[in-house]
Every structure is written in structure tokens, then in C-alpha cells.
Amino acid sequence: MALTTHSGKLIPELQFKAHHFIDKTTVLYGPSKTGKTVYVKHIMKILQPHIEQILVVAPSEPSNRSYEGFVHPTLIHYRLWLADKQKKNDNKGAERFLEAIWQRQTMMSSIYSRVNNIDMLKTLYHKLPIDIQQKENKNIAKVECLKAEQTDQKKEEKITSLYQQLLKKIIIQNIHMYKNLCLTEDEKFTLNYINLNPRLLLILDDCAAELHPLFTKEIFKKFFYQNRHCFISMIICCQDDTDLPANLRKNAFVSIFTNASICMSNFSRQSNRYSKQDKEYVEEISHIVFKGYRKLVYIREDENRQHFYHSTVPLPTAFSFGSKALLKLCKAVYSKEVVIDKSNPYWSKFRLNF
């Protein structure tokens, strides 16, 4: 339901959809206890059917247990850091953490692109028995005609994706038919990884202190500017809009403000370079939006050209994020023992020397 300002301006309500967040960066701004984590979990629920992998970095998780029951403990990190076997105490652990994720996702992206090569999918389709092809040819022909007639690039990309998904669906449904066929290495590779979902959800919850040294690093900029190429959906929770530099703030696809004062501060800040019209609009609507549990959402590239919305989401009920295979692996390697960080200099004060 849309809200109306005193001057008659409308503020539409936004119903979150997966396309708002998949392969994009979302930033939530607001002090503690203003509902940021409620929104994160709501977004997780929306993305659950589309993304099978997740990593959470949440320094406050040991005390508040915000993600307990939603994300397996093995996928939650209390700090942005990855050890180096040669230099366990160096100060580049945060960079290594992000670089490891980026390298893995780059490989996942490469495999996914190879598997989804249309020429290879068509080759595999035409290796199916004739009766199966005759059954599916009508649907295939429809999509091929749509693709040939399309002149709009974005629509053509959507139809190409639809064509890929249709071919993959037919191949997967009949994958047993390939068992006794003579196949090339590329064909075997495609069949082996045809169900691969490369997408990863990365949540950085109140990690401002650890992120600050990374703002000028190329690896962190990649996560903001190139994450869609590696199928990374990123959610960052900040206490204040100044927790991120202006160039990164402006590149977030979705910005969610859980507090009126931080919202006003963000849009009035000179370095963010919002238009005078946007500043005046936010000043007018913020008095109306931030009541009860309502929040303000700003979408940078909005296909509806509205950009500003109000939103209210329900309290989340527990669910386990991740694929069955991921959760099975997590359970296999999980240890309930508390792991002590022995690189902490104070560890030497407590260890037992026999």
C-alpha cells in the first residue's frame, strides 16, 4: 500500500523479489536493534530457492547468535580473516579471505559458463532418441523463433537464458539416456556439472572495523563492481553510512535504511552527490516512512524509475539456508568444541605449559 505525503507525493510499498538481490550488492544502514538482521533473514528466505551456498562474517555472533538456526555454524566466521600457513600472524588475513572466495567463485563461474554453452547443449540434445526430440521440438522451435525475431539486447539475453534452461531441463530429465553413448570429454564434463549452481551469498554483518583497511584494495572493489560476473550476492550491514566510502555506497544496487537520522544523513551528505530533488524528496518522506517497523529502500537502477520505496517485512521463522549437499557436508565436519584463536597474543597467558 502506497503512502502519501502532505504535498501529495506517493511512496510505493516494495515487495522484495529475488531479482532485487541476485548477483548484486545490498547495503543496510542503521544502529543496533533497528531491524537490520530481520531484513537480512527476509532476503535470505527470498534467495533460498536460487542460491545454495552461503558465508557469513559476523563478529558479534558469539554474543547475539543472530544467525543461529538459519546458517550452519561452520559457515559463520567471527572475523574477516584467513590464516596463511607460512605467516600465521601477518596482517593480510582479511585480504586472503576475500581473495580465496573470489578465486573459488571465478572457477565456479568458468565451469558454469562452459556447461551452459548453447552449442554444447544443442549437441547433447540432438544425441537424445528421436522420439524424445520429436516430443520437445515444438517448444524448442518456439524459443528459437523468439530469439531470431528479437532486436532488443536485454530481451534477447532473457530469451537466450530461457533457451539454455529449456535445453538443460530436457537433458537432465533424460540424463540416463547418455549412459551408454560414446561421448567426448567436453560432453561428459557438461553432463557431470549440468546441475551446478555457482551462486554464493556473502553476508558481512557489522564488520566495519575489519573492512576499513580494505576499501582501497582491488579485491574489495571487485566484490562491489564485478560481483555479478562471479555470481556473488553480497549483503553488508553498517551502523552508519560513513562505514563505507562514498564511491562504494553509490555502487550498491539496493540500500535499506532502518533509521531516519542515518537516512537523512546519507542523502544530505555532499560526497554522495544526490540530486537536489532527491534530497528534498527524502526529507519530506522520511517523517512518514519511519513509523512502526517501516524502513526506506532505495534502488539505484530501478526499472520502474521510482527508486524510493517503503517496506515492512515479517519476523523470520527459522530455516536452514543452503543446499542439502552443503548442509550434509557441514554436519560431517562440524565440531561443537569452542575453537580458540591461538594467534591472539593473549593466548600465551592462558595456555598450560607442562
Curated annotation (Swiss-Prot):
Induction: Expressed in the late phase of the viral replicative cycle. It comes from the Viruses. InterPro entries: P-loop_NTPase (IPR027417). Keywords: Late protein. Belongs to the asfivirus B354L family. This is Uncharacterized protein B354L.
